[in-house]
Amino acid sequence: MKVSDIRSKFLQFFESKGHTVVRSSSLVPANDPTLLFTNSGMVQFKDVFLGTDKRPYVRATSSQRSVRAGGKHNDLENVGYTARHHTFFEMLGNFSFGDYFKREAIQYAWELLTKVYQLPADKLWVTVYAEDDEAYDIWAKEVGVPADRIVRIGDNKGARYASDNFWQMADTGPCGPCSEIFYDHGPDVWGGPPGSPEEDGDRYIEIWNLVFMQFNRDEQGTMTPLPKPCVDTGMGLERIAAVLQHVHSNYEIDLFQALIKGAGRETHIADLNQNSLKVIADHIRACSFLIVDGVIPGNEGRGYVLRRIVRRAIRHGYKLGQKTPFFHKLVGDLVAQMGEAYPELAEAQSRVVEVLKAEEERFFETIENGMSILDAAVADLKAKGGKVLDGELAFKLHDTFGFPLDLTQDVAREQEITVDEAAFDAAMTRQREQARAAGKFKMAAGLEYSGEKTVFHGYDALSMDGVRVTALYVDGASVDTMQPGQSGVVVLDNTPFYAESGGQVGDQGTLVSGPAVFAVADTTKIQSDVFGHQGTLANGALKVGDTVAAQVDAVRRARTVRNHSATHLMHKALREVLGTHVQQKGSLVDPDKTRFDFSHNAPLTDAQIRQIEEIVNAEILSNAPTVAQVMPFDDAVKSGAMALFGEKYADDVRVLSIGTSKELCGGTHVTRTGDIGLFKIVVEAGVAAGIRRVEAITGDNALHYLQSLDARLNEAAAALRAQPSELVPRIGQVQDQVRALEKELEKLKSKLASSQGDELAAQAVDVKGLKVLAAQLDGADVKTLRETMDKLKDKLQSAAIVLAAVADGKVSLIAGVTADATSKVKAGELVNFVAQQVGGKGGGRPDMAQAGGTDPANLPKALAGVTEWVSAKV
């Protein structure tokens, strides 16, 4: 039974039992800052269990995408080395919100496992909480599980209700006993039943956990029965698939085998049992779905976890000899396996490929140098008998070459050494403190100030003369005089500079007083009505009480206001096209773009994006005036002005009317909509469950973007000798031609392999009754080498053969040994004998092995030594 069938049968079964099939929520938990990633099926129903949310159904079932990497739940270091650890997995679950309870939950589970999945009942064991007689009796008396296969588990974690079979969401709140179902793999696998000293073995594998939320636990630890008990169950799809497909490792199921084959294809590795291929296959799932849900590689939070996973996959590819980006090429394989179940993956395929490729290209620029340093350090350490790698070196690899600590630890573990984490942490802390000291002038919000307020004039002016310096700060401390070259913060009594707020970035510009010139890099608020002008004093001295001429960077401001005004028009258009459920969830307006996050539960279609662009550009063409009014908050709301949910507003607010848009806004804007010039959406993506993101550009940025697209379109048309209007059908013709040529090429390669096989067979040397052949095939690829190898083995009947090819400075090697000779000559050893001489390594089965190398100059010598090497073996 394929993974896709197992998933669909689960959902269909519970749907037939009155459950609503609920789509998987985002891997980025909505409104839960305590959780890095969604790591179980119940996460999207947490508020329902807590009683703070209600759904239109009381029974639900789902297949939830989940990630365990980073934070409390982190399986990253074990992935690829064990049978069942993954960064990404799917959790099948059924849920009852005050509807059915233990009896139905247990009966449903048993029916699905034994009737739908047809697992042998005598292979299933169950556990119950020691005091849960109700669950025990249901299993024993109603389901009919023999008593010797029902295990009571008590408080085995050192405290009351601290048990593998008692679940609690937190120290207080909903909790209750649980019942776990185990599958017995049989006596050929070591391990004991749950609750026994040997329970950590692999014979008895947990496949399903049924949680019965029965009590509410208060701060004193008192358990009070819930008026409406709930059920939360979870079954790992990969685990149950391994059971149903009669394999012991999750990596042997059909879904993973397809991804592992893809990883082998892209890394040119024939031995699909290598742990590195398992790592790559696992990581493409986690990385792709994180990107689908709006996470992008970065240096903090979720983005850094994603970067760590991507770079771990790249390192394992590098370990296999892959020196160019390959990881992003597996997205297509993943879509083929999971795109039907998760259409959002297929829809985001090109974006996922783009993000992964960019991250790969970035890391491949440094990985070779970093690995050279790391390999040398490890070799030196082992030569000296050491066991702990210097943490300072690990930090250098992190800081200079982009090696996450766990990547270095991964390499160290393979060499049976560890990394000094304490020294790494100390180096990291030291760097952060230095950065914090260097950047103190940026921390305007933390400065102490008790002087007069700043009066903002930037709605009407970009420059002002005679404004007074009321305070100066250097390194976070108040000073009377700022010296040339110092960075700090200047506070003025009046200013045309807009201070960052409401998503709009702060202004840049200059403050000039005689010879003193202060370059303003940013403007932020020290207090709600006190502006801090952050920057560096280029020359001269500046004192408190000096008067300065303040000049805002007019070009930068103009680009920013175009983007801000366009944001308002876009918000209105989004509500018009998608519905009034659209609410702003965040924004960033800078000179380059506007980024707008909003509530919506589906990706925008191309047609919707075009419609939004048309609405906004029509507003721009109308050249309507922008009108700003200050009025009481209640009056503003009554007038129809949109306010942001959860935002705190003063008694009097500024209402901005631009075109048909009307919002509360304190930002700066164009005078008329025509000043925006042009509007173009360039990015649409998901960032969290029910949250979408749009990025757009305006004015000259939009014009340059479209000109660039036009230029590339013309280049493509010229390359295909077609007019731009004929490009699509011309591409179709070229694709047809390519496919036809590829078929013809395959035929020619097959003929070549056959003819070369005949010619090469005559070159074989007899060594003690075994035919030995080592040859280089010019122009051959790996497939041709394999086909030629098969023909030679058939023709020679008893032989040891090495075939090689060189392309783009890289060596491809295939070794083959006929079955009668594998007891004396192993193909894996033979191919490694040659590979080591050409800067590579490889492996495979005793009868067939593959390798690669990077030094083709040594290939003739290496091939010449094959006969002598085989002679020594036989």
UniProtKB/Swiss-Prot annotation:
Which ranges form a coiled coil?
Answer: none
Signal sequence span is none
Give the GO molecular function terms.
alanine-tRNA ligase activity; aminoacyl-tRNA deacylase activity; ATP binding; tRNA binding; zinc ion binding
* Source domain of life: Bacteria
Where it sits in the cell: the answer is: Cytoplasm
Q: Which reactions does this protein catalyse?
A: tRNA(Ala) + L-alanine + ATP = L-alanyl-tRNA(Ala) + AMP + diphosphate
The Gene Ontology biological process terms listed for this entry are: alanyl-tRNA aminoacylation; negative regulation of DNA-templated transcription
Record EC number:
6.1.1.7
Q: Indicate which residues the UniProt annotation says bind Zn(2+).
A: 564, 568, 665, 669
Which InterPro entries does the entry link to? aa-tRNA-synth_II/BPL/LPL (IPR045864), Ala-tRNA-lgiase_IIc (IPR002318), Ala-tRNA-ligase_IIc_anticod-bd (IPR018162), Ala-tRNA-synth_IIc_core (IPR018165), Ala-tRNA-synth_IIc_N (IPR018164), Ala-tRNA_ligase (IPR050058), Ala_tRNA_ligase_euk/bac (IPR023033), DHHA1_dom (IPR003156)
Q: Which GO terms describe its cellular component?
A: cytosol
Cofactor(s) in the UniProt record: Zn(2+)
**UniProt keyword annotations, A-Z:** Aminoacyl-tRNA synthetase, ATP-binding, Cytoplasm, Ligase, Metal-binding, Nucleotide-binding, Protein biosynthesis, RNA-binding, tRNA-binding, Zinc
Q: What binding details are noted for the cofactor?
A: Binds 1 zinc ion per subunit.
Q: Which family does it belong to?
A: Belongs to the class-II aminoacyl-tRNA synthetase family.
| UniProt remark on domains | Consists of three domains; the N-terminal catalytic domain, the editing domain and the C-terminal C-Ala domain. The editing domain removes incorrectly charged amino acids, while the C-Ala domain, along with tRNA(Ala), serves as a bridge to cooperatively bring together the editing and aminoacylation centers thus stimulating deacylation of misacylated tRNAs.
Q: What does this protein do?
A: Catalyzes the attachment of alanine to tRNA(Ala) in a two-step reaction: alanine is first activated by ATP to form Ala-AMP and then transferred to the acceptor end of tRNA(Ala). Also edits incorrectly charged Ser-tRNA(Ala) and Gly-tRNA(Ala) via its editing domain.
Give the protein's recorded name: Alanine--tRNA ligase
State the organism of origin. Cupriavidus metallidurans (strain ATCC 43123 / DSM 2839 / NBRC 102507 / CH34) (Ralstonia metallidurans)
